A protein has these predicted regions:
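Residues that flank catalytic or metal-binding motifs in active/ligand-binding sites
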Residues: 74-76, 88, 111-113, 124, ...
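Short, conserved beta-strand segments of beta-strand-rich sandwich/propeller modules, principally
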Residues: 77, 127-129, 676
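Aromatic-lined, polymer-binding surfaces characteristic
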Residues: 185, 197, 201-205, 211-213, ...
Length: 783
């Protein structure tokens, strides 16, 4: 690609994030580095991974280079944006007409960086080399990525950044002064009416007052920040750093304004009301509603869909609705214009361009911002009509109705008849939240009943709630696929819609995590119609279309839950986990699924691996055996069971072409206290198989006696196996503590999430050969 400016001080010449413009084919990846090294183009970066670092730390795990002929005379510094493993040091070497320029970075921490290599007056770059050095004792199973390479002029950058940092809190032409006295009444009544607000205030008073509400803590987070100091040309995708600039890390404009707006009208706090309006003005003054230049690079069609625009639209519409009295007419109309142009323009383009949006979560994902903005525009457009008569019907309304039709089309495609959903419980509860809040707003605007607008297919997900509702004390649901947490408002809507389902169980556990009060005004409003507890679990609950099931039995008054993971052909956002299982007992997850983590953390890719699940995996030197993902085959457990017994089998070789020629997994349990898992297997290639069992609980291994004990708080599990099995307990690296601080930037996630530890305990049982049977017997007992 050509050297392309991204602002007045910087330009890029290597767009690794664009699959067409990426220059990866011009790079040479040198051998002699890490074991199992792979470098491949992905949808938003070039990804590298390896299985084991070089034994000699002076040998780069990854070395790649290319030649080029680039005029750099207008710039002073080379920039390289990449993600490297924690502790890694990265060397950049540039060949120029004035000699070689070289730098070695300081050790990487937890986030991606933009490395700067001074060019020392050079005017032409002729070659580039990247080298990544790591400590072989720490770096096993590594994933990282390369984003882009560019040039920078330091003096011009300072001038450019001064231009961006021009805002203060006065907003004289746009907002009412601090002396203004608000009425704390909604402008449009779409989110809540004045009467509903009064009921919410009474509920807060009954629950201990404002400081007892989790919304108070979220509002205090908003109050601690200065939105004007976080305003740039772009808007970060929450605290996600995958696509933003390093200098914009921590500039978290989204969500805080919406939280401040809700807290303002709930607690009658005028400073929070004006603060919410300031957040909205900062969003309105951001040049582009995207995390960085990636979506707006001249000559490049890569874009990150409508994720950030839809979030900005929602925040701005909510703030206009709840705190609209704080805006001047001019300030309000500025936001309305951005909603119509930047917001709806991007959403409509995405809807027309990308058909896949209707076959996954994303049409619904974008919908609350799209719908709320349309409804606010309905109430305010036309902004000018004199000297002509104002239209009797809104010209916006047909577009609003089209948006609702898009939502219904999307839900009809993604909700399965057995109540399943392929992308896991976090994606589903967020999708359900987006869908139901969209129907909620539309119903209020049209004078309809919200429940009557919600598609019947959503009600079938009561089955999913029962299959995935966790009996572990620290979990609301079993976090399969890319799940990190269960969005509370989504659980609230589902419990409100299906008060006789286990969505009530999930929502009530979520509210308990937030001190007995929900985090948002809507959830507080819905809670009044949700029962105090959910129903009892049924002994066997199956979802044959998606290939998942759960067995529920009791041992001494404590639940024993066994969940089996299958597959619907082509299912997306899933992991390499078909045939995996989760075992819960006495309030703990003895065999666990660790779900996912922040997508800015390469660990999110590692957690998809079959080696991180309760799986049987082939072993082979120098490679990581893995199944296809997605797998284009239905994998469904065949099961029978009651309050006492359970038996299931799965045929699992599909997706493992080139590895397994036979893999049948059986679960047999004559009583809730005992379980035998038997794998009957044969390989096309490899040295044998390893049975992985992973949990957060401590594992004590007695290899001599072929036994491992997993200790819970109220129960224990004893695992035994036959002769000829090699056993080892490992502590796999998991999430560094710094990521807890990152998550705290989004309290709506942090307050209900089950946090990862620094390590993932894993029992590995290896059986050598090309075929065999591996049986693991489990005995459960109460302490």
């Amino acid at each position: 690609m050509q050297l392309t400016p991204i602002n007045s001080a910087e330009a890029i010449f290597e767009a690794f994030f664009d699959e067409t413009l990426s220059g990866l084919p011009q790079w040479t990846v040198h051998g002699g580095g890490a074991e199992g090294l792979q470098v491949a183009q992905r949808w938003a970066w070039v990804q590298y991974e390896w299985q084991r670092a070089p034994a000699d730390p002076a040998t780069p795990a990854l070395r790649m280079s290319r030649t080029l002929d680039l005029n750099c005379g207008d710039y002073e510094t080379l920039m390289f944006s990449l993600m490297a493993p924690p502790g890694a040091r990265v060397a950049l070497v540039a060949g120029t007409e004035a000699g070689e320029r070289r730098m070695l970075s300081t050790p990487f921490a937890h986030q991606k960086r933009e490395l700067l290599l001074p060019l020392g007056g050079a005017r032409r770059i002729t070659a580039l080399t990247l080298e990544i050095y790591v400590d072989s004792r720490q770096m096993v199973g590594v994933v990282g990525w390369l984003n882009w390479i560019g040039l920078q002029h330091g003096g011009q950058l300072e001038r450019y950044l001064r231009q961006v940092a021009r805002f203060d809190e006065r907003w004289e032409d746009y907002l009412q002064p601090e002396s203004f006295e608000p009425a704390f009444e909604p402008a449009y009544g779409l989110h809540l009416t004045g009467a509903e607000l009064a009921e919410a205030r009474a509920a807060v008073a009954k629950g201990g007052g404002p400081k007892a509400s989790p919304l108070w803590e979220q509002a205090e987070d908003a109050r601690r920040l200065v939105p004007e100091k976080m305003t740039t040309e772009y808007v970060n995708f929450w605290n996600d750093t995958r696509f933003s600039r390093e200098r914009d890390t921590g500039k978290h404009l989204l969500t805080h304004g919406a939280n401040a707006a809700q807290a303002s009208v709930l607690f009658r706090d005028k400073t929070l009301g004006r603060l919410a309006a300031r957040y909205a003005m900062c969003l309105a003054h951001s040049t582009r509603w995207d995390p960085s230049f990636l979506s707006w690079l001249p000559g490049c069609k890569w874009e990150h869909r409508a994720f950030v625009p839809s979030l900005v639209m929602y925040d701005c519409a909510l703030i206009l609705d709840l705190c609209g009295e704080w805006f001047t007419d001019y300030g309000r109309q500025l936001i309305l214009r951005r909603l119509a142009e930047e917001g709806q323009g991007t959403n409509n383009y995405n809807t027309w361009w990308w058909e896949y949006l209707f076959w996954c979560n994303q049409t619904a994902w974008f919908m609350p911002g799209r719908m709320y903005a349309y409804l606010v525009l309905e109430k305010t457009m036309p902004a000018r009509w004199d000297p002509y008569p104002k239209p009797a019907a809104s010209r916006v309304a047909p577009y609003t109705d089209l948006a609702l039709a898009d939502l219904y089309d999307n839900l009809a495609k993604i909700l399965l008849p057995d109540g399943g959903y392929t992308e896991g419980p976090m994606y589903f509860t967020f999708t359900a939240r987006q869908a139901m809040i969209t129907c909620y707003y539309y119903a209020r605007a049209r004078g309809k009943v919200s429940r009557e607008l919600i598609p019947p297919a959503i009600r079938a997900t009561a089955q999913m709630a029962e299959v995935l509702a966790s009996t572990a004390d620290d979990l609301q649901m079993i976090l399969i696929c890319d799940a990190q947490y269960i969005p509370q408002e989504g659980a609230a809507f589902l419990a409100w819609l299906m008060p006789d389902s286990h969505w009530v169980t999930v929502f009530r556990k979520s509210v308990a995590r937030t001190g007995g009060q929900p985090m948002t005004l809507l959830a507080q409003n819905l809670l009044r119609e949700v029962p105090a507890k959910g129903p009892e679990f049924r002994p066997l609950v199956e979802m044959p279309k998606i290939g998942q099931l759960a067995s529920h039995r009791k041992l001494g008054g404590e639940w024993v839950k066994l969940f089996l993971m299958g597959n619907q052909s082509g299912a997306s956002h899933t992991h390499e986990d078909k045939g995996s299982f989760v075992l819960e007992f006495a309030g703990d997850a003895f065999a666990r699924d660790f779900g996912s983590c922040d997508y800015s953390n390469p660990l999110a890719d590692v957690l998809k691996h079959c080696q991180r699940h309760n799986m049987l995996v082939p072993i082979a030197a120098g490679v990581r055996p893995r199944p296809a993902n997605p797998i284009f085959a239905d994998l469904t457990p065949q099961a029978r069971g009651d309050e006492m017994r359970f038996h299931a089998t799965m045929e699992l070789k599909a997706g493992w072409e080139g590895w397994f020629t036979r893999w049948t997994r059986m679960w047999d349990s004559r009583t809730p206290a005992e379980l035998t898992i038997t794998d009957d297997w044969a390989l096309e290639q490899g040295e044998g198989v390893t049975f992985y069992w992973t949990t957060t609980l401590p594992i004590t291994l007695d290899a001599k006696n072929r036994r491992a004990v997993i200790q819970g708080r109220r129960g224990r599990a004893t695992l035994t196996w036959g002769e000829g099995i090699e056993a080892v307990v490992e502590q796999l690296p998991l999430e560094e503590p710094i990521w807890k601080k990152v998550m705290q930037e989004r309290k709506e996630q942090y307050l209900v999430a089950t946090l990862h530890g620094e390590t993932q305990p894993r029992l590995a049982l290896t059986q050598r050969g090309r075929s065999g049977q591996l049986a693991v017997r489990v005995k459960l007992e109460l302490l």
